[in-house]
Amino acid sequence: NMVKLIYYRNFEVDMDFKRHIAKKLNIEGIGEDELVSMLALPPNTEMGDFALPCFKFAKIFRKSPALIAEEIAKSVPADEFVSEVSAVNGYVNFKIDRDFWAKETLSRVLSEKERYGSSDEGTGKTVCIDYSSVNIAKPFHIGHLSTTVLGSSLYKLHKFLGYTPVGINHLGDYGTQFGKLISAFKRWGSREDVEKGGLRALNELYVRFHREAESNEALNDEARSYFKKIEEGDKESVALFEWFKELTLKDVSKIYKLLDVHFDSWAGESFYNDKMGPVIEELEEKGLLKESEGAKIVDLEAYGMPPCIILRSDGASLYATRDIAAALYRKQTYDFYKCLYVVAYQQNLHFKQLFKVLELMGKEWSKDLVHVAY
């Protein structure tokens, strides 16, 4: 009913009632603050709203918890707050008057307004939240919606509870696809058409490249060459890449504005280009890096997982390498209390491998990394 909807459950209201119950209890040698901390929620709400376990009192009073609970229940009278007190299996159960609870809760809602339910539990704690992670030069699609909305909700909830959230859009802005896009643009595109068409025009160029490459393998070689130029800092190639990035962010920002979604960091895959060397060095120093069929891996067989590939046989880094570098950077930069990755459940294995590799590297904080799967 409506009363049940209203009274369940506000932390501050709970604390007020716990304090009231503790004041009513007169248990020798047990202070009010300790009683407040002992009062818990019963497993079944039909039994009561708060329960006091009496097992720790058995040694003090040399009686069974059940007998102690009965004696306490008899000694505590009901009042305008507490409508019923009962003893069950060593617990003292307290039922709060529903009308009073509803009035108390509504009073707080009216006085605190939009701050109702907030707390300062997260004061001084930073929580990194990795969500949305759009791909440069590709449109924002339905697949991005879940991670974007869930991540934004977690951001707002943590902020409401006093944490300092850091919203991170880990952009997909690295890979040979950008060499393909430069090749396609230089062959069939124009600045005027792309400025006018935005992401749609870029996507059309990308699709055309793949269509043409089916019968012309030389295009893939050309794309690899352009991507290498980006990596080497070639002015023209980097300028085109940055322009594609700018057009993408301009386009997706309209969607983020509609959804009321915000980010504090847009550091994507390319941001970690110069941060992977130290990761590989550390893995080697700690004896974690092994060679397998020309590739560099971390063997996770002992943990029931396939190997985590760090470097391909051609020396190229992989997704896992960048995510290790990103986790290290985020810990160093934000000293997070938790780091949440709001990513589809299909990536479960990737995150299990990532967290395990960081643990093997001796990063005690790896336990604070959480994959929020959906």
What spans do the regions from the language model cover?
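Generic start-of-chain signal for non-secretory N-termini
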Residues: 3-31
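NTP-dependent nucleotidyl-transfer catalytic core
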Residues: 7-11, 30-60, 64-374
